[in-house]
């Protein structure tokens, strides 16, 4: 049985999607509550919806982030950027006290931030980093 673990942000994911829903609801409620004599031009409507869509795309990027460790290596999705790093290329994982997220360090001294593991998630983040460190070949 292959050893596969996936880590996703806890609180940040909930906050990202909740903010997206709240933003949409407030926009619709305000739009419906405006008096009839107040209306937006087409350009204003387009600008408003483009800004809302941009914010929703950003929030979805936070929510969809993950770190997946399997027998071959680590797969990282930070927002819309994807990395696949084999275990043989990984030197270790660093997460200092108070750090917002851990960092994967490669043998070439490249660094990949692991946004899916949020330091604010406390024990979950410490457990995830301990697991990832245990998988690095000696």
What are these regions (language model features)?
Residues 14, 88-89, 116-121:
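A short, sequence-level motif marking secondary-structure junctions
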């Amino acid at each position: 049985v292959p050893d596969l673990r996936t880590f996703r942000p806890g609180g940040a994911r909930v906050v990202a999607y909740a903010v997206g829903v709240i933003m949409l609801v407030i926009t619709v409620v305000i739009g419906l509550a405006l008096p009839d004599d107040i209306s937006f031009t087409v350009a204003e409507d387009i600008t408003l919806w483009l800004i809302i869509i941009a914010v929703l795309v950003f929030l979805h990027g936070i929510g969809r982030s993950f770190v997946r460790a399997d027998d071959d290596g680590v797969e990282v999705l930070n927002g819309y950027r994807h990395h696949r790093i084999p275990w043989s290329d990984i030197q270790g994982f660093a997460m200092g006290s108070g750090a917002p997220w851990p960092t994967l360090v490669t043998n070439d001294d490249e660094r990949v931030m692991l946004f899916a593991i949020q330091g604010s998630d406390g024990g979950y983040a410490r457990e995830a980093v301990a697991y990832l460190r245990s998988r690095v070949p000696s």
